Amino acid sequence: MGDLSLDTAVHGSEGRYHGDLSDEWEIWGPNGGYLASVALRAVAAESRFVRPASLSCHFLSGAAFGPVDLDVVHLRRAKRAESLRVTMTQTERKVLEALVWMIDTAQGLHHDYAPMPDAPTPSGLPSTEELTDEPRSKRYSFFTNVEERPTSWIDDWEHREPGEPRMASWFRFRPVATFDDLVVDACRSLILMDTLEWPAAVRAYSGQLPWVAPSLDLSVRFHRFEPDCEWLLSDTTAAIATDGLIGGAASVWSATNRLLASGGEQMLCRPVPPPA
């Protein structure tokens, strides 16, 4: 089982940082949101501000578990905001490139017209582990790091009817559920927003599919933080698939019905490799 704060930690200074990708965050290799989280930690270490405003990244090549290097440069320094670029490399191969805005918290306009999705509370829902007979050993290690309580469930997955490509689940990280550090708290949203687009997309089809679709990019806006809130709702749609791309939008909500983060990503379809 991984620990989000420990497994995204970086060390270094003056624009040069190092991290170590943990295999506890595996889904088809290191989870994309996990990679973005390590990159965000490096940016936060370099910035004089503590509040992330947005992150946009490209996944450039597959990463392996183990050491990574992160180079961070300032693109703009202003009184209340900084724009920074971070490049993650592994054995001289570029893995990820991201742009991040970090800001100083300040007074400004305030309104909230974001409607909470219609979803039951997590307290009345069973966990994925209670809903499936699949042994934990057959699941990706990523899922040991979160307790998931889906708002809907398909019992007979192999014979499912095609439906709306949407998935919503409540998640609680484990073994540690909440983090006082705003950047680590933001990492919770980053990871959840990269996790459900493929499961949402495949709900539009039945049976086994001849394609998989890794993420090309990820873009997230951090609206607010509730670091004391254990349960987060991740609501994801993959509304369109065309030209070999699957486009999705995602949002993360607190158990107090407030929007924490929003964004989306594009995934690129690739044929499923033939059996060995």
Explain the meaning of each model-derived region.
Residues 1-276:
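Terminal targeting signals and extreme-terminal segments of soluble enzymes
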